[in-house]
């Protein structure tokens, strides 16, 4: 499987790119962050002026976070670069397995300003519904198994399935999980290496974080797993509110 990380050939999508998509509209990803560290990159989501939500497996010692980026070869006047001031990792063990905790909150070294190309994406108010059409995006590879990385982010629509679909596709998954299963059953469209940490947006709400998938990406009947943002809301909001010792949901 593919963790979707640029440097890992395991089951995580730390660096997946969208396969089967098209270049994102320049105005549809104002919240999309690009995290970079010595050739390794991931996606992330700006959830307010001071916080970015991404995947734990995207963590690196030296990270530079770009906001307002579209074409990596062209710098917008309002592009902003930040560095992590604090990082928070989901600490819960009770009722959470290793599959449920690939989520990281990054506090930026200074707030970003809303602009033409930068604006946060709200956290979800409700969990997503199976059958929803969801949007994925990132600078991950657009081909598999051989990687091709674009200068611009690609976007695609995929479908949200019952978790049992992913459990049937991959051996070793737990019976239940706080992850979302999404993809296209006929294959050809998927997140992939380089897309890890980026958002899964269902019906306009930020519902998932790119986590794990098949290797190679975009194979038939091999949807990917996304960390379920809604199931981590208590922890996210507690940390942002200043309760840095927040542990598990009640």
From Swiss-Prot:
Annotated tissue distribution: Expressed by the venom gland.
Pro-peptide region(s): 12-17
Example GO molecular function: serine-type endopeptidase activity
Pfam families: Trypsin
SMART domains, per the entry: Tryp_SPc (SM00020)
Statement: the UniProt record of this protein carries the keyword Hydrolase: yes
Cysteines engaged in disulfide bonds, as pairs: 24-155, 42-58, 134-202, 166-181, 192-217
Protein's UniProt name: Snake venom serine protease pictobin
Source organism of the structure: Bothrops pictus
Top-level taxonomy: Eukaryota, Metazoa, Chordata, Craniata, Vertebrata
């Amino acid at each position: 499987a593919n963790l979707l990380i640029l440097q890992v050939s395991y089951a995580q999508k730390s660096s997946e790119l969208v396969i089967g998509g098209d270049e994102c509209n320049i105005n549809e990803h104002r919240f999309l962050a690009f995290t970079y560290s010595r050739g390794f990159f991931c996606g992330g989501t700006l959830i307010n002026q001071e916080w970015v939500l991404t995947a734990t497996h995207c963590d690196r010692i030296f990270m530079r976070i770009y906001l307002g980026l579209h074409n990596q070869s062209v710098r917008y006047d309002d592009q902003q670069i930040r560095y992590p001031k604090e990082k928070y990792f989901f600490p819960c063990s009770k009722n959470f397995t290793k599959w449920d905790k690939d989520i990281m909150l990054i506090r930026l070294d200074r707030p970003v300003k809303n602009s033409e190309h930068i604006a946060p994406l709200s956290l979800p108010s409700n969990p997503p519904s199976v059958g929803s059409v969801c949007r994925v995006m990132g600078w991950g590879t657009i081909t598999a198994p051989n990687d091709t990385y674009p200068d611009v982010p690609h976007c695609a629509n995929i479908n949200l399935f019952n978790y049992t679909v992913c459990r049937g596709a991959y051996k070793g998954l737990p019976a239940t999980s706080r992850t979302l299963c999404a993809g296209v059953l006929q294959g050809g469209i998927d997140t992939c290496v380089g897309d890890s940490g980026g958002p899964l947006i269902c019906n306009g709400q930020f519902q998932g974080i790119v986590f794990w998938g098949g290797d190679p990406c975009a194979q038939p009947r091999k949807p990917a797993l996304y960390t379920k943002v809604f199931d981590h809301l208590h922890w996210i909001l507690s940390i942002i509110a200043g309760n840095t010792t927040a542990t598990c949901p009640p």
